[in-house]
UniProtKB/Swiss-Prot annotation:
Post-translational note: 4'-phosphopantetheine is transferred from CoA to a specific serine of apo-DCP.
Species in which this protein is naturally found: Leuconostoc mesenteroides subsp. mesenteroides (strain ATCC 8293 / DSM 20343 / BCRC 11652 / CCM 1803 / JCM 6124 / NCDO 523 / NBRC 100496 / NCIMB 8023 / NCTC 12954 / NRRL B-1118 / 37Y)
Signal peptide feature range: none
A GO MF term: D-alanyl carrier activity
Subcellular localization(s) per the UniProt record: Cytoplasm
Cellular component terms per the entry's GO annotation: cytoplasm
Subcellular location, principal: cytoplasm
Similarity section: Belongs to the DltC family.
Disulfide bonds: none
Protein name: D-alanyl carrier protein
Biological function: Carrier protein involved in the D-alanylation of lipoteichoic acid (LTA). The loading of thioester-linked D-alanine onto DltC is catalyzed by D-alanine--D-alanyl carrier protein ligase DltA. The DltC-carried D-alanyl group is further transferred to cell membrane phosphatidylglycerol (PG) by forming an ester bond, probably catalyzed by DltD. D-alanylation of LTA plays an important role in modulating the properties of the cell wall in Gram-positive bacteria, influencing the net charge of the cell wall.
């Protein structure tokens, strides 16, 4: 499973639905993620990919779509 598939799987679990066909849809505008789910997402991504994504440095505009989450994780991995 590649990075994108792994991230989509994490998102699907947190959101509770398949978002693989909504890769550019805004989680927050669509009410799919709230603050608690966002913290859960960051913790899951940190654990799975051994990255640091502190909540204190979270910029919603950089994490608001599945494609942006993938890009952000890729940038944090190296």
């Amino acid at each position: 499973m590649d990075l994108k598939e792994q991230i989509v799987e994490i998102l699907n679990t947190i959101i509770g639905e398949d978002i693989s066909d909504q890769m550019d849809d805004d989680f927050f505008e669509n009410g799919l993620l709230d603050s608690m789910a966002t913290v859960e997402l960051l913790l899951d991504l940190e654990s799975k990919f051994n990255i640091q994504a502190p909540v204190s440095e979270f910029n919603r505009d950089e994490w608001n779509t599945p494609n942006k989450v993938v890009a952000k994780v890729e940038s944090l991995i190296g």
